[in-house]
Amino acid sequence: QVVARQEHYESLRELIDRELRELNFGDLTDTAMAAAAQLRERQAVPENYRITDPDIGAGGQKMKYQNNVAAIRLLKTLEAEERQASPAEQDVLARYSGWGGVPQAFDAHNEKWAKEYEELKELLAPDEYAAARGSTLNAHYTSPLVIQSIYDTLSRMGVQPGTVLEPAMGVGNFFGLLPQRMGDAQLYGVELDSITGRIAKQLYPKANITVSGFEHVNLPDNSIDLAVGNVPFGNYRLSDPRYKQYGFLIHDYFFAKTLDKVRTGGIVAFITSKGTMDKQDTAVREYLAQRADLLGAVRLPSSAFSKTANTEVTTDILFLQKRDTPPEQLPDWVQLGKTADGIPVNRYYEQHPEMVLGTMIWDKSMYGNEKETSCQPLPDADLKELLAAASAQIAMPDAERLARPSRASLEELQASVNMPQDVRSFSYTVQGGKLYYKESTSL
């Protein structure tokens, strides 16, 4: 029995040895290593930030200041360590809201802000400090409520863009609230301020973000499906030879250049100063009407930005669809009308008073003492409900034009965005191993 048992064990050992010899441990090792590499790769791929807090950017001036400083300190740490922000760190960066709501931090004579004034001077490089101080005039960020309303309107229209442009993006709240149905779109953002633009790059690493003035950005004409954003507004002009003859104020310039970049049938959904619609001079509206159809407009109450920007200013949301040819006759919205109380407003609002989400009154301008009009909020009104009702009244875009493809490929778009500033117009350049010809502003 002992001998038989020994022979059994030896046969079993031979069977095990033969099975082990037939196993390909090299393949198993390669498979395990490949799986580990794929896992590391998935973990290393940075993701665009998703805004889930409806009150992001809200708060008092001191809180905004503290959030801004925390974001800047983190940004400088990330850049020193040459790494991408983690999701938890993106939460900190996303609370940066710019300096439009806290100009006191740059006032050397404000005793209540003396500590913050000194802290900022130490934290920021001289060029960063100068840019931040200069941004207090128009760096007013948009509330998620208003952005969500814009996207709800675009979704109802059936807008399904392949490319999205935000030409004055701040830290990118429009990108952070992009609907899931638009998640495959290629994102292009532009931001003038260095600190803000660098934060945006950390928040949206999959987007193509250019830190520069919009007037210096190279994009092919007729290449963008959808442009969204809150354009800067003020009584000053940018230097761009292409548009010099028109003398556009900054907010009107953003409309003009963006319409050139959007393809025929594409949509522009911008928040702008009420001056675009209400100024007495009709030249800008004539320019826009020759190039785009106004699908609708919503006048926001002056309180719409009070939580996120600590400012009260009357603004409009405009929805435009680019035309291929000028209309035979200029539309009514080029002209001015009056409210029932005799307040001058755009004729669109005269004909559609339900799109004014407040009461138009005479007021003092945010830029001086000259008498101006503003949209006073309705008492106890729910802005979310008002926006939903107004959104339902926006006209549908022309479906045939909406479905047209862009004239520029994504490859051409990318090459134009990455083109060095010193490439001269009407000359050849190599981008990504391919030869391109630069026209006036794009490849």
Where are these regions (language model features)?
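Charged, often flexible domain-edge or linker segments that flank or initiate folded functional domains
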Residues: 23-95, 99, 113, 172, ...
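Short loop/edge segments at beta-strand edges and connector loops
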Residues: 210-213, 298-299
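Class I S-adenosyl-L-methionine
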Residues: 45-203
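Conserved Class I SAM-dependent methyltransferase catalytic core
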Residues: 194, 247-306, 313, 317-319
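Long amphipathic alpha-helices with heptad-repeat character
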Residues: 2-5, 9, 13
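Flexible, glycine-/basic-rich loop-and-beta segments that form/coincide
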Residues: 307-404
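Conserved proline-anchored active-site loop of SAM-dependent methyltransferases
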Residues: 147-157, 161-179, 189, 200, ...
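Conserved beta-strand segments of alpha/beta enzyme cores
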Residues: 186, 207-208, 293-296
